[in-house]
């Protein structure tokens, strides 16, 4: 899933 550290977690 989204990596820890990215502020804008945009799931495509």
Swiss-Prot record:
One of its GO terms (cellular component) is extracellular space. Coiled coil: none annotated. Hemolymph. Belongs to the tyrosinase family. Hemocyanin subfamily. Hexamer. Does not function as a hemocyanin. This is Pseudohemocyanin.
């Amino acid at each position: 899933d989204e990596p820890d550290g990215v502020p804008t977690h945009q799931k495509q």
